[in-house]
Amino acid sequence: QTKNLLNKKGEAIINALNKLKSRGLVKKLGVSIYNPTELDHLVKMMEIDIVQAPLNIIDTRLETSGWLSKLHKNGIEVHTRSTFLQGLLLMPRIKIPSKFNRWSKIWDCWTQELKKNNLNAASVCLSYPLSLPEVSRVIIGVDNLNQFKSLISASNINLEKKDWSFMKSLDLKLINP
């Protein structure tokens, strides 16, 4: 994690990783971030081959900060995660835990837009990172084979480009549940 690289022992960790890479024991070095601002320091400290970061229709910070484009231009692979915001974006409206009620406007609009346009939530969620040429990989979690097959099918649906900007939030309590 980034915090381990940014503390006093960070330089020793980076040196050890670089030695492993120079010996051919490690092919690529990557970092997993929670906030694109972490990259401000990390890119100065080490040569990064892969960045794993959250990216979804609510948390677009990697793209809007300009880091997605910068990483791509520098040949750094971007692997995105939290595509479904820890599953919240796939839950029926009534199943979203009450601790997320303060964002009810977002959930209500999301539910209405999906219903109004006859859209599948998984397809919409996957279409955002998959539509970005700067994204190398989209990481998703699955519980079983049927769910995996369903998500593969959802990822293959070509959706018309739609503006989901009403979903965006910078509230860390929402985007980092």
Over which residues does each language-model region extend?
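Beta/alpha (TIM)-barrel catalytic core signal, keyed to glycine-rich beta->alpha loops juxtaposed to Asp/Glu
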Residues: 1-169, 174
